[in-house]
Structures are given as structure tokens and as C-alpha cells.
Amino acid sequence: MSDRDHWFEDLASHMKDAYLRYSFTKGTSQEVDFILATTGAKVGSLFIDVGCGPGRHSLELARRGMCVTGIDVSQDFIDIAQRNSAAESLVNAEFLRLDARDLINHAPLHAKFDFAICLCQGAFGLMIDDQHDVEILAGIRRSLKDNGVLVLSAFNAYFSVKHHADAEFDALSGVSHETTDIRNELGEVKNVDLWTGCYTPRELRLVFNLAGFDILNISSVEPGQYSN
């Protein structure tokens, strides 16, 4: 585990299970339908879920017969994922606390997986420094077998500029900053800062190519409405 702090850990520690009450988490089944249809994954395929959070995509993939390893920087979220996996006896899902920036140096997970997912700013796009997103992509690339496939979502810079009037968008870095209130299971409110790395399609192509990926497709999607 990296000794580098990540701002998201405090948010996860406050929200815990309440994270799964947020509306953007309700489209998990449809998103997994899309992932399986797009990748052509078969029962028993090996997935890594980078920035898995409390495991909503990992667990759904495991229910469909995939073998999944989820990693996340938040121990609180990993604990939730492990608890829910055990409750459903999903022996084909495992969860590990690991900073996605350190995946590139975590040899036990290298060249192991058929597919990778990194969705809803679980890791990619939660970094304030562009170099960290590059590190994450390089680590994902190293975790995949030859010809492995990554499905990743990133926040659209054009959408952020047009629709996030209350956020501060830094055009030079592509980072959007805003403050918002989050609630935990007890309804306790905490005001927090959010930073989101936003990308144009061209920027995604460039950063993915730097990490050794070939782009197969870029689509505009919304939570629970993934399509090509």
C-alpha cells in the first residue's frame, strides 16, 4: 500500500455503505450488461476492477460467473466489498486494498487478467496530477495479458465546462473543483472538496497511447445508460 495520501479516502470513510444510496450507483446491472457484451467475456474470464469502491461492479460480474479482483485505495470500501461478497458466498471475487498508482509495481497482479474495468472515476480521473493518471493506465496495462481489454469511463471536459456552473474548471490542468455535502448512514452531513480530472476524446486517445493502449472505441455515456 502506498504511503501517499489520497483525498478520496476521507470521503469514503465518511460515506461507507451510504455510497451505494447515491443515484449514479443504481445502473450497475445495465453497465455490466454492456461490459460483457462489449468485451465478449465468457464465464471464468479474469477481471480486475481498478478503483472498485465498495465492489458494486465486481460483485455483479462475479454473479455472472466472472473471476474478479477488485482494488481500491479505501480500506473502508474494501471492507464493505469483502463483507458483501462473503454474504453471497461469491468465492470468485476477491478484494485488495491497493492504491491504483502502485499497480504498476505490484508484481502479483501483472499479466494476469483478460479484462480490466475502471469506472465512475474510481481511480482514473480522481487525481489532481496528470502524471498519476498516466501511472494508473500504465499499471492497468501491465496487469493485463497480451491483447487484454480495458473498459474505462472518464469525465467529459466539454460537459463539465457547459453544465457544472458551480464548479471551478482549470483549463490548463483539466481539473474540475467543487464543494458538496455528503451524508453517511446516520444522515450526518460533511462538506467536502471534490476534484475530477476531465478529458476530451482527443486527450484520452493521447494518454492511452502513451500507456501502450490502442483505442477501439470512444462513446458518450451516462450512468446506467452505457452504449456504443
Report residues per predicted region:
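Conserved class I S-adenosyl-L-methionine
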Residues: 1-42, 44-51
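Class I SAM-dependent methyltransferase SAM/SAH-binding core
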Residues: 58-103
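SAM-dependent methyltransferase
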Residues: 147-211
